[in-house]
Amino acid sequence: DFNWSSIYYCLLLAYNSNEKFTKNGEDTDMSLLSNEQINDELIELNGWVFKDDVITKTYSFDTYMDGIGFVNRLAEKAEEVNHHPDIQVGWCTISVTFTSHDKGGVTAACVGMAQATEKLSHLNKYN
């Protein structure tokens, strides 16, 4: 039996976790990060790689539909915060890439969305 209330609770936790980066009380989500800052942030994000002005990670799922459920949850979160990844769907794998096309590189918003993506990836049952 599928427990919708548990999924709903987990989704609420994930969606309400807007990671914001501030400096002197000022929102810095759309400021480009230095290579050093990006690499420092990625220490906490297991499996994420920084290369060619993007951060990316490939996730594996037990079933194709688990991966699609993850994509749907990620798409909703991206719409909510207006920061959208490039997503590549494979058989039981999903690759997620963040960059700011406007700024030409990785911003704090990219890192914040990578953190949110990590949380969403643990809700691996499709709905």
List the predicted regions and their residue ranges.
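C-terminal structural segments of small proteins and small subunits
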Residues: 97-123
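Short arginine-rich
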Residues: 47-50, 75-85, 121-124
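N-terminal first-folded block
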Residues: 30-64
